[in-house]
Structures are given as structure tokens and as C-alpha cells.
Amino acid sequence: MNKQLLSCSLKSGKQVTMVVASVATDGVDQQVEISYYDQKVIGNGSFGVVFLAKLSTTNEMVAIKKVLQDKRFKNRELQIMRKLNHPNIVKLKYFFYSSGEKKDELYLNLILEYVPETVYRVARHYSKQRQQIPMIYVKLYMYQLLRSLAYIHSIGICHRDIKPQNLLIDPESGVLKLCDFGSAKYLVRNEPNVSYICSRYYRAPELIFGATNYTNSIDVWSAGTVMAELLLGQPIFPGDSGVDQLVEIIKVLGTPTREQIQSMNPNYKEFKFPQIKAHPWNKVFRVHTPAEAIDLISKIIEYTPTSRPTPQAACQHAFFDELRNPDARLPSGRPLPTLEMDGPMGTGEVSTTSGDVAGPSA
């Protein structure tokens, strides 16, 4: 285990850090010596710090996520990241351990591919300009997000923190990559999980109801709220607290029925809610929002978890038909990135939990 970093200054004045790191393969640890420079902080959070750096041998930009390690537990994020290999998921290249300033402090450092933008910043850019994000981008970003979810769900992993800040974007190619697996977990049927996960605006209602036996469909709900945010230019359910979050959802979906509450959390006993009617979906969004977009969101943002489509099924929805056109182009004129469907379903196959999700009825 590497705990020592060696820093030195070159004649050029660059501060170079050399380290022995493990190659991020799912198998036997292979150690290599790497060095990087031009390190600067690009993100902070409760998890730790993210640095931007350049690998000395290739000048390739990388992101280094530094996380304080609890020695009592294996790091779940590292275990999961080593398993993942998908074009719409950020790639873990290397990892190493380093000592902290305090005695016995140990940090895990994940060296990840660097992707310059996020859906959050792209959406905020258009919002500040008082412009709507081009619909081709909504389709492109959502399709790739759903692809990444289809992949991780097929191997039993739930991300549990889908939000615009965790969706990285290459603005030139239009490629989206899902990042931050710090909350991710292998979900095992009938094994309890904590309900207090996922950022508030994007939390599925079963989590707000305190469910501990939830499924991968919490990620699908979160994806639906991201799509709604791209169409609206602001979060669809901007709650100030857990209870307020539920109020925001009820304002749109109406009061959940007793059966819907049971489907979200069978142990929930309080049924005292004001009776509010559902708001028509076409009145939630702008006048010229495509009917296919509204139809897809109405199927995803649904109280009953088993009624939400799987990511594979959602990818087959008519909203994404433009992406299947070989002549489709980005606003820049560039061709779309490769968008074949991955995972066990294969191209063109559909699996739904609640019947057809092909598109709005005529």
C-alpha cells in the first residue's frame, strides 16, 4: 500500500508529484509509478477534495478525488469503480493511498478521466441567457444517462445520487459520463438500505417515506427529475426540507392513494394528507414542449416504483427517435456521438415494468 508521495520541482518551476499507484483493473493489483503536475483544486464536498492535474508522461488531464478513508471498512466507491467499464461512465484509471497530516490518517486517491463540464453548468448557462436548452441536447443527455443506468442496474448497482452536478459533459462531442459513485451500492433484495440518500430535489418519494427496501427505480425517478429540470430551466420539485419536498411532488402528482403509499413503503402508517388533485402535465411545462417529452416524464415521475419504466425501456421511447436518425447532428454541425444500447438487453430490445412506453397515444 502506497502511503508516501514524493514531490519535486523541475527547472521549469513545475511541482511534480510522483507516486506508486495501482492500475484500476478488476482483478490482481498491478502497480505502476506515475507522476503528475499542475495540481489545482476544482471541487470540495463532504467526501473530500477533487484536484485537476496533468499526467507527466502524456500531458493528459485527470481528476484526482481524495477521500478520507475509514480503515474499518473497504471503500465501496473503489470496489464499484473497478467493476465499471462503459462509455457513459467516468473511467477510473489508477488509485493510490496517501497519509494525512494527523497520525493514522489515510486518504484514498482516485485518478479519474477528466471531463470538463457538467449538465448543471450547461443548464445554468442557458437559464442565465434566458434561453431554452436545445431539445437535441435534452435528448442526447437523457439517452446517455439512461444508458449508463441500464448498465449499472444490469450488474446490480444503484447509483443513489443522480443529479445534474454528477453528469459530466464533453461540450464538443456531446458525450455524457456519469460520475461520483460515493453513494452507490449493490442492492440485494430484502436487505435493508438507508433511506437518507440522494440529493433532496432528486429524491424518489419512497425515500421521503422512509423506505429501506427500495430498488433501482429510485435512479429512474431521479433521471426523470433531471429531464424535467432541463425542460423547465429550474428544478421541478424544489423542496426546502424532506416534508416540503413531498409537498412539491404532491402539487404536481396529486395526493398519493393509500395503495401508492403502500407500494412506496409498506410500513408507513400515517395517511393524513390534504387531498390535492394532480396538475395536468402539459400545464407543468412550457407551451411548445414536445408531447413525447411530456409523455416520457409522466411515465417516469410516478409514485409506484414498479410502474416506472426500466432505463432500457425508456431508451426505446419515441422522444429519442431523432437520435436514431443517421443524419441527426449537434447544433455545431458535428455528428452525434455513438449511441448504441449496451447491457444484457441488446439493441432494440425492450423491457418494461408497466406495459408500453413507446410514446404518447395518438
Curated annotation (Swiss-Prot):
PANTHER family: GLYCOGEN SYNTHASE KINASE-3 ALPHA, PROTEIN KINASE SHAGGY-RELATED. CDD domains: STKc_GSK3 (cd14137). Belongs to the protein kinase superfamily. CMGC Ser/Thr protein kinase family. GSK-3 subfamily. GO terms for cellular component: cytoplasm; cytosol; nucleus. It comes from Caenorhabditis elegans. Residues 325-362 are annotated as: Disordered. One of its GO terms (molecular function) is ATP binding. SMART domains: S_TKc. Pfam families: Pkinase. This is Glycogen synthase kinase-3.
